[in-house]
Each structure stands twice: as structure tokens, then as C-alpha cells.
Regions:
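Active-site bordering "gate/hinge" segments
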Residues: 1-143, 167, 280-291
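Dual-mode signal for accessory low-complexity, basic/Gly-rich regions
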Residues: 130-291
Length: 291
């Protein structure tokens, strides 16, 4: 992928690890397993029309060369566009497209709110059988599965994939032994990876109407308590119905609890160590601070 004169990978680092885990306790738990992982980082650089560098990281349970090649190609294109971007988008409300890691982080709200650790202290009002997106969903209803990336939890609980949300309905509460017993539910262990089985619209279809697609934030944040998400725009593509313009600066501010009824997901997919699902999500009327 590093074949362009104007944009290139200027440095990279790969780490491969093998971890042996053994779990014992006074209740008779005696289990062990080994796990391999691949992670790393690289920096892409574009020299003209301005010198710009951008950092990328990656992590997989097994090396996914196809996904890594795609990420590298996208990173090279993004750093070229960032070097060409000179203005922030105008202040206003936009049809917003978020993709990749940002979409993964958004799904963290539902995973967090469905955990016994959040429900028992009263931080989350989730209950089994509730409609997590409300009763009047105009977009897609969520289908979210917790993926067991390890055979046992840190407490020695056998891990298995769990259907967390099906057609927008919370199917179960999950968590550690302590908080699960407090709530009277079966302990499952905690999960890091999710699979999202949604997607009704191709990414190309999403881009036919005017949009703002933020592909890089300076620091994207998702608050599972309040539902607010956002961050400063490092690079976004603005389509006005005729032309696509790279923009930089300004910030996005939205609330997933207010926007979740209208979510539409792409049929195009994205996968990393902790997420497997649609590449992009479409929101309507999201506030953007700009020039």
C-alpha cells in the first residue's frame, strides 16, 4: 500500500503475543487456556500541500491481512485529504455518517447499560424485555451479540456468545458473579467484543444525498451515562449534493438516546478485535459546530 509519492507509511510497529492464563479459586475452579493476539501501530504522512502525519493502530485475535491492508489504504487516502483540507464545515445540523471505530464505540452504550455492574447501582434502567430504542423506531432495530473472545472469564465462568439485543429488545442482563447474584440472574462473565447484525443500505447509497462523513476525530468520546457523543473533527468529507470537499476543524455533538430511533446501518462491513458488523451508521440532524 505504501506506493504513493505524496503519501506514505513513515513508520510501523507490529506486536505478536501468546498469553497463558490459569484460573483457580477456593470453589474448585481450575481452568487454563492460551491465546494469541496481534497488535500494532503505524503513522502515515503526506508532504503536500502541507506536511501532515496521522496515527493509526490495530488489534486482532488472529492476523487479518485483508482488514489491515484496507485500513492502510484508507489511512493513506485520509492523510492526503487531511493535507488538502483547509476549512471547517459551516455551523449547522447535518445528516451525519460515522464509521469504523466510532460506530464500535457507539455500540458500547448498549453493552455498558445492559451489564449487571451498571444496573444494580442504578446507573442503568435497563430491564430484560425492554425496547432499548423506545417504542417508535423508524430506523433499524438493533441486533447485538456479545462475542466470547476468551473461553473463560477472570472468575472461571465458561464464556459463550450471548444474544444481548434482538430486534431492539433486551434479551438478557450479563455480568460478573457478584453483581449477577445481587440481581438474581445467571452470571456470564464480562465481554469485550460485540457482533452487530444490522445493515439495510449500502454505503454508496448513504452517500447519494448531502452528508458529513467524519472519518477522523482528534478525540472521539461516547458517554454511556448521558448518551452524549462527539469530538473535534480532524477530517471529514462534506457532500453538498454536487461536490465532496475535505474539511477539518469544528466539532460534532449528538445524543445517541435521542438519535437511536432513526439509525440506519450500512451493508458494508468492518471488523477489528472487538467489533464485527456494519461499517457505517447514518444519523439525521446532528449538530455540528463550525465556521
Amino acid at each position: 500500500m505504501d506506493v504513493n509519492e505524496d503519501a506514505f507509511i513513515n513508520s510501523s510497529e507490529f506486536l505478536m503475543s501468546k498469553t497463558n492464563t490459569a484460573i483457580y479459586n477456593s470453589e474448585g475452579v481450575d481452568v487454563s487456556y492460551e491465546k494469541y493476539s496481534v497488535s500494532g501501530e503505524f503513522v502515515v504522512q503526506c508532504l503536500t500541500p502541507q506536511d501532515v502525519e496521522q496515527y493509526q493502530d490495530f488489534a486482532y485475535d488472529d492476523l487479518d491481512t485483508e482488514a489491515l491492508a484496507t485500513q492502510a489504504a484508507q489511512a493513506l487516502e485520509m492523510v492526503r485529504m487531511r493535507a488538502a483540507a483547509t476549512e471547517a464545515p459551516e455551523k449547522g445540523n447535518y445528516r451525519l455518517l460515522l464509521s469504523g471505530k466510532e460506530l464500535r464505540d457507539l455500540m458500547g452504550l448498549y453493552v455498558s447499560r445492559a451489564s449487571a455492574q451498571m444496573i444494580y447501582p442504578g446507573y442503568s434502567a435497563y430491564k430484560k424485555g425492554m425496547q432499548v430504542q423506545g417504542d417508535e423506531v423508524k430506523g433499524e432495530k438493533l441486533n447485538l451479540t456479545l462475542h466470547a473472545s476468551e473461553p473463560y472469564s477472570g472468575e472461571g465462568i465458561p464464556m459463550k456468545d450471548l444474544q444481548l439485543i434482538q430486534n431492539g429488545t433486551l434479551e438478557r442482563i450479563y455480568g460478573t458473579a457478584r453483581f449477577s447474584y445481587y440481581l438474581g440472574v445467571e452470571p456470564t462473565g464480562t465481554y469485550k467484543a460485540v457482533k452487530l447484525d444490522n445493515g439495510t443500505k449500502s454505503f454508496d447509497e448513504m452517500k447519494k444525498a448531502p452528508y458529513l462523513h467524519v472519518v477522523s476525530f482528534s478525540d472521539f468520546s461516547m458517554d454511556s451515562f448521558s448518551g452524549y457523543f462527539g469530538g473535534e473533527i480532524r477530517l471529514a468529507y462534506l457532500y453538498d449534493g454536487e461536490n465532496v470537499t475535505p474539511v477539518t476543524g469544528g466539532s460534532v455533538s449528538g445524543n445517541l438516546l435521542e438519535l437511536q430511533k432513526d439509525m440506519v446501518f450500512s451493508t458494508d462491513c468492518y471488523k477489528d478485535k472487538n467489533y464485527d458488523g456494519p461499517f457505517a451508521v447514518e444519523f439525521q440532524n446532528v449538530a455540528v459546530a463550525g465556521r
